Amino acid sequence: MRFGIFINSCVCALVMSVAIAPSAVALRQAQGPSGSLVTPLSIDSAPLVTEPVEESASLPTTVTEPVEGPASLPVTVTEPVEVASSPQLHSTNKARSKTKAQRYVESISRSESLKSSVLGVLALTEGGDTLASWNSGQRMVPASTMKLITTGLAIHRLGPDFKYVTRIGYSGSIKDGILDGDLYIVGGGDPTIASKDSIAIPRAKLFAQWKSFLDKAGIKKINGKVIGDGRYFDGPIEHDTWSYQDIGTAYGAGGNGLCFYENAQDFRVSAGPSVGSPVNVTVSFPNTPWMRYEYPCRTAPAGTGDQLYLFNSEFLPYAEIRGSFAIDRKPKTEEFSNKFGAYTCAHYFCEYLKSNGVPVSEGPADIRLGRVRSNLSSNEYAPYASRVDDLNMLGQTYSPSLKRIARETNLKSDNFYAETLFRTLGRRFHHSASYDSSYVAVNEVMKNIGVSADDVRIVDGSGLARHNYISPSFFVRFLSAMMDSPSFADYIQTIGQPGNRHYESRLKDAPATVKSRVHLKSGSMNGVRCFSGYIEPSTGSKSDTIIFSIMTNNSLAPASRIDPLIDRIITLLAADN
């Protein structure tokens, strides 16, 4: 948004383009047509420092930036910038009364570490004071800071005490202790089943609960299958914009209605005896005897690192581990993805039943395209699976609470949990867990908290996609809106703090009095480093809470050079409050 201020004198006309920072409240409330901000114009004696902003394609655009000149006369230089045809919340330039944080942001924008990079910053108090701003309306790739949005919407809409439900049911009939039919594990989206996460119910305990339902029903033998039913989530298990290399990793596993071990699989790998020899690879857990694996990966020269990638698909039980593993690397456990979570869950519960005196005549199966599939290598399908509503339910178990799942999502930056939350919103509020439906549901929940997402693009819940485009100003107004949510006290507890678990190295030079007031979430991928969050006020006044978003994109510098710059911004912001 640009306001032209014309100051006429008898000597000359000076034209200045000024973009004024919207407050945290104005970012949410003062919106005009097409999501543009309507901000009251004010002029004071503070120096004007401006930066590039996007404009409507129909308008001529100029940018003013400071140059050296006489102290008594502000001097500006105008130059053309590219314009955008789509409306967006436009970047505030600098705070009208410069803070230390603002001055530091301006200085690092010209640093070698951020050379030819995109830097976006916005920090406001909830009361409306702008503490730092730079390219705040620039849409950028958020990486894992996207999880702040996903967890916030889930906690707000589903409630912090929401729990996923997994049900055990059967088709057919029970007579003389024999189930003449199939046993169903009906997934409800619980992402923690058999997870190694500390919040998850241990697998043996969970399976014992499931078996107790059979015991109460008098089932001692199953003449049929144990079917893993993941139909609660429809559609592909990963987003179609994810990198093919990513979807083979554990962090790109993707979620479904019934999962197992976060749909991950561990492999033990070690270098071969010489450069060029095969890498030694063995499946660790879970064991998937129906899978066929090939390992066309080779031992590489010392210093080349770990370049192993698994390529797999949910359509066929075949996978390859390609790439290389340096000869000087120590043996390690690689975490890759398992595209058959529901089948794996059925397999392991089937084995549990057999080892505890309940034979299963036809073994495990899952459901694909509505049909029972017992042999993943065959194109042959059994008849259609029973409808869930037609099953006889024996019992149900519950996941940990949503606030605990959301906390692990943000602290561990768990993509699997984040995607599950994202798709749960679609399933619960738009009748489908497909990514398209989930996106619609997310937009609806966003409007419910008073935030428009018209000026950003959201395609997944974890931030793994490079097709997410979020601006610092959007993060700030979203985080500001969350402060008014009845679930905010639970939400802020999901966000990490410097010095605590997973953030031990953040703000390491800052005093403890500063660290204890900062809540932040990081996001990183190649060329991307972002941090967003809150700084609690030393005054204890809600209006003094600082909401910040600091984003860098297209950087060639390593995180070890970018992070200290971001840490310094956050420390200076906290010092001002």
Regions found by a protein language model. Name each.
Residues 89-110, 156-453, 542, 575-576:
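Conserved serine DD-peptidase/penicillin-binding transpeptidase domain
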Residues 133-149, 153:
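Short active-site loop at a secondary-structure junction
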Residues 131-133, 412-415, 419-577:
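Small-residue-rich helix-loop
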Residues 135-140, 335, 462-465:
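A short glycine/serine-rich beta->alpha loop
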Residues 1-98, 376-388:
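Intrinsic disorder/low-complexity segments
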Residues 109-134, 365:
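A short, well-structured edge-of-sheet supersecondary motif
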